[in-house]
Amino acid sequence: MLTVDSQHCFSFILLCFFSLLCYSLLFKKLKDSHVGRDLLQSPPSLPIIGHLHHLLSSLAHKSLQQLSSKYGPLLHLSIFNFPVVLVSSASVAYEIFKAHDLNISSRDNPPINESLLVGSSVFVGAPYGDYWKFMKKLLVTKLLGPQALERSRSIRADELERFYRSLLDKAMKKESVEIGKEATKLSINSICRMSMGRSFSEESGEAERVRGLVTELDGLTKKVLLVNILRWPLEKLRISLFKKEIMYVSNSFDELLERIIVEREKKPNEHQGTYLMDVLLEAYEDEKAEHKITRNHIKSLFVELLLGGTDTSAQTIQWTMAELINNRNVLKRLREEIDSVVGETRLIQEKDLPKLPYLQSVVKEGLRLHPPLPLMVRTFQRSCEMKGFYIAEKTTLVVNAYAVMRDPTTWEDPDEFKPERFLRQEEERRALKHIAFGSGRRGCPGSNLATIFIGTAIGTMVQCFDLSIKGDKVKMDEVGGLNLTMAHPLECILVPRTQPFISNQQIPSL
């Protein structure tokens, strides 16, 4: 016999089923109004849920790539009858970002985000408008633009030296090194010192806690993005699914960042607008500011910087080093270039990067094969036509960057690690189809900084160490997540090959 709780559960499932069925019939009637217009091809789907099972795959980018390989590079999918346009080829993606950039410059900010990232005041997910433009301008002028990057170059040099010394210490002790973890330390310390003039302490455990929160947030964000697909009538259910996790991560970041903000407010004249944090606090306190922001705006932005500016770079460094270890001929050529340009008496520097075209090509190739965000999601704000097909207003756009950058019609041997492709003029023109950091107005504003992090970190390891692993090849399996993550973290034994001159200047403590 069913218990009362079981009866309630069964009744709820029936209610959801019939609600979805009724909604499907209603949507079908609305869709009939577009009869006579050319609609995109749609692969076979399942009743009620449509193509949801492809997005719920642990490796959704590969599942969608296989779907496009079979049915075409431009497809119409349905998730509970909500329309989705899937793009999986370089030529189609290029056309969309060129012809429809403004129309797809916004993202939906669903209710489940209200309690995520210390409030709904996010920058990355904000609609394209005054607030988004204001925050992007601050990011560019104070952190990510060419002049800002030049001002903070010495900070990154300090952190790169610290990164090298940490690796050297482990090498001398013959300890294995988890490349992703060390790269994450480099990225987090650099971003924090560049944006707020301080880093997190290793001795107190503060740094380890922040890295743990970033990892938790990455996994949680993936869950939230997937459950956001379950729109009406399951809104209340989807909000409650991860409420406990959301509140824990959000409250933890809120506590951490509130403490930092209070510290800054006690010393208002110490930095005088030097760092992004100070400029944001000035705007927060200024009643006549160009755009009024709240404390949650400030906290949300720094959470996004930690998530988007650290884990993505660290994962790319790890993936690219794995490719170099598995392709020793490429590693040999790269080392020869670095030795000839930089030498053995000093550590590689940012100023060397323009003189190292093969290193730049290695970075591009690593990003091509392993884009940090394999799926890019936007929303068509208005109805339009694309390649002669009708696209309804509020249709979700999914650009499979993973598939785009392995498109065999654009890239020769698309699944092979061949950095030299970017040295050839013809392939350099094809690099316009390289969308590892997105494209258009909503492209990643931190792409230049990420390229610097990745290039100097890889350059340091190749210049200074021989790398060995257990077995002949690094396992290149992926694991599901917001970012493209290695299922088996790359661990190496490092053997010093050169010990370039390191200044006697004391590096700030972690």
Swiss-Prot record:
Q: What is the lineage of its organism?
A: Eukaryota, Viridiplantae, Streptophyta, Embryophyta, Tracheophyta
Q: State the annotated membrane topology for this chain.
A: Single-pass membrane protein
Superkingdom of origin: Eukaryota
- GO molecular function: any one? iron ion binding
Q: Which Pfam families match?
A: p450
What GO cellular component entries does it have?
Answer: membrane
Q: Which organism is it from?
A: Arabidopsis thaliana
Q: What is its main location?
A: membrane
Co-factor(s): heme
Q: Which UniProt keywords apply?
A: Heme, Iron, Membrane, Metal-binding, Monooxygenase, Oxidoreductase, Transmembrane, Transmembrane helix
Question: Could you tell me which PROSITE patterns the record lists for this protein?
Answer: CYTOCHROME_P450 (PS00086)
* EC number from the UniProt entry: 1.14.-.-
- Location of this chain's protein in the cell: Membrane
Listed name of the protein:
Cytochrome P450 705A20
Q: What class of enzyme is it?
A: oxidoreductase
Query: What residue ranges are annotated as transmembrane?
Result: 7-27
What family classification does the UniProt entry report for this protein? Belongs to the cytochrome P450 family.
